[in-house]
From Swiss-Prot:
This is Serinyltransferase. It holds the Pfam family ADDT. GO terms for biological process: symbiont-mediated evasion of host restriction-modification system; symbiont-mediated suppression of host innate immune response. The keyword Nuclease does not apply.
Length: 411
């Protein structure tokens, strides 16, 4: 059977990791951050966690029997749209399970409206997309109006087959931004998913990281700031946390250039393992890296696997009418057993492990990457026992004269 997307064949680690973690090194230090990024991206390239739940739902469509390739394509595009709307596994999978293609006829759209209103309370959207939950019906209506009776492939084909990649992106971006209640995040996530479900066939990508967008690009810009050892350029609502001054275009351009170079380096080193473009590198290489440098809501190898377990468990309990069998199957094929909650020893509490979140920030050691490289499961009792150094709290570090994380926090 020919598949449009990359299909999982079972997790296989490299014979030798290119960026092994040394437990005696503090990877918070500016001189070690680029190495940390590459170790992180290398790990994600093998677990494919940077493609999040989309890869699981896409797998479910690929293995669906009894439908044609064109029918699969229609389902894939619809799933990408739903991912842009919801940005989690629960919303897209439950809607898709009831409506595997857009509800374009008046009768089907009415059924969608009735179904959505009936199930509104148990529907879940990602926190960043929570306001769209109450606007989902007009959002879908806007998408259907744009389709104007066409199949999705017929509607997107002239945009996808644009000769110049820069023109292709502008057309796709302007189209997505034209749908009701779609903004930068939803348009970005939609295009990232659209490229993935086509197996990178159309090489959809953004020409740059848009770091001059003061609010819309704040998360990835702050990741670029940490990577560039410019922690004094970390902002909130476009203003530097250190002094309240707006970040300038010139400063944004410096960070853009640094992030672009890091992106190109990672493509050169890991692009043969998985496709890496700016659309997915923004999340994995910048936004998630930024979250290393805080105590709560951080990211780590296995975080996506754990939160996905939480979401599938929620659906099986709260939406029992829809099967999640294909999602469980995809997980087992993408991930090593050491990252699967369902393969954990007896007594393990599944789901997101919040005790993991502050470890890197407090010690400078990415134990999550180290454990993946060792092929071992990270257990709560092993938070510090594997370290060849004393636990180094932030306050134990001498004050640095460089502009780095520790000096910024002390200020």
């Amino acid at each position: 059977m020919t598949h449009l997307s990359k299909m999982p064949t079972g997790y296989t680690p490299p014979a030798e990791w290119k960026y092994p973690i040394d437990l005696s090194i503090d990877y918070r230090k500016p001189e070690n951050r680029m190495y940390l990024l590459k170790a992180w991206v290398e790990a994600l390239s093998y677990t494919e966690e940077h493609n999040q739940q989309v890869r699981l739902m896409d797998y479910a469509i690929e293995v669906t029997e009894g439908i044609t390739q064109l029918e699969k394509i229609e389902r894939k595009i619809w799933m990408a749209f739903l991912w842009g709307c919801c940005y989690n596994g629960i919303g897209p999978w439950t809607i898709y399970s009831e409506f595997p293609v857009p509800p374009q006829s008046p009768q089907e759209f009415k059924r969608f409206c009735d179904w959505y209103n009936l199930n509104f309370e148990r529907m879940r959207f990602d926190t960043d997309c929570r306001y769209r939950k109450s606007k989902m019906i007009p959002c879908v209506q806007s998408y259907i109006d744009w389709l104007a009776g066409r199949t999705q492939m017929d509607a997107f084909r002239p945009l996808l087959e644009t000769k110049l990649q820069s023109d292709q992106f502008v057309k796709l971006w302007d189209t997505a931004m034209g749908w009701k209640y779609f903004g930068r995040l939803s348009a970005w996530n939609f295009l990232e998913a659209l490229n993935m479900v086509f197996g990178n066939m159309y090489q959809i990508d953004v020409p740059g990281f848009m770091l001059r967008d003061r609010d819309g690009s704040e998360s990835n810009r702050n990741g670029a700031a940490f990577l560039s050892n410019r922690d004094d350029w970390v902002t909130k609502h476009g203003k530097k946390k250190i002094n309240g001054c707006p970040i300038t275009d010139e400063e944004c351009d410096i960070l853009e250039a640094d992030l672009e170079q890091a992106f190109k380096d990672c493509v050169a080193e890991f692009g043969h393992i998985t496709f890496i473009n700016r659309l997915n590198f923004e999340t994995s290489g910048a936004c998630w890296l930024k979250k290393f440098f805080r105590l709560k809501n951080t990211r780590y190898i296995g975080w996506d696997a754990e939160r996905t377990w939480d979401e599938i468990d929620y659906m099986e309990r709260i939406w029992p009418e829809y099967s999640c069998k294909a999602l469980w199957e995809a997980r087992s094929l993408w991930l090593p057993d050491t990252l699967l909650c369902e393969k954990a020893p007896a007594g393990h509490v599944p789901g997101v492990q919040k005790w993991k979140m502050p470890v890197f920030f407090e010690t400078g050691v990415p134990l999550h990457i180290w454990h993946l490289q060792q092929g071992t499961r990270w257990e709560p009792s092993e938070v510090y026992t594997n370290l060849k150094m004393p636990v180094r709290k932030i306050d134990d570090n001498p004050k640095s004269t460089s502009v780095n994380l520790m000096s910024l926090l002390k200020r």
